[in-house]
């Protein structure tokens, strides 16, 4: 009799195990798994506006009588500025960097040569010349103080930047065509190689106005053929764009 009861107990045990396995399987399937959201890292130690590009209209100030500009005298510059915030909110900063710039001037200040090869500066009427222009390429060293109302969550903000720029003119060229002779003066030694002046830029998001004024004259102690001092300075007005 004892032997005949053993299979029944074994069968009951087997069915009990199957029931428990099925129960836990159904329970685990109905269990709601929490949704895993991706972790977004926020850089609270951000820096702003470290690359720049500008387009300007170039003017000459402190000009002698009769000097005028014609056409569009364009200027281009680009460079890098290291942004160094000085407060916890990073709304104030100092920036210093390195850049390159190109300036072109169409005007009636002519540079020619006399019979001995000496340079002659004169202010001529436009009906006396076919074309006349001066251009220079420079390495720029800007340093500026910055204010902006930026946050690490937005790339759109107001800004006002003001600073001082020191430039070295590593290449200059003037071309005069008076209808009879073309004079090309390359790397004129009378040009101030080192030029400096204050600048300011201000705007919102992409669009920012820019202005630079040269403090020292474009030429060193030069007089025109009529005896007028040539103390012209540069003035650049235009737009500047910042990225990163």
Predicted regions: what they are:
Residues 29-83, 242-244:
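Short glycine/proline- and aromatic-enriched beta-strand/turn motifs that initiate or cap beta-hairpins
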Residues 1-34, 239, 243:
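Bacterial Sec-dependent N-terminal signal peptides
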Residues 37-49, 85-92, 150-158:
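Short loop/turn motifs that connect adjacent beta-strands in outer-membrane beta-barrel proteins
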Residues 47-49, 70-76, 92, 135-141, ...:
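Residues that define the transmembrane beta-barrel architecture of outer-membrane proteins
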Residues 40, 46, 187-244:
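Predominantly the C-terminal beta-signal and adjacent terminal strand-loop region
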Residues 50, 59-60, 68-126:
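Glycine- and aromatic-enriched membrane insertion/assembly motifs of diderm outer-membrane
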Residues 64-71, 106-136, 169-197:
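Extracellular/periplasm-exposed beta-strand and loop segments of Gram-negative cell-envelope proteins
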Residues 78-84, 98-100, 141-149, 162-166, ...:
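Residues on the lipid-exposed face of transmembrane beta-strands in outer-membrane beta-barrel proteins
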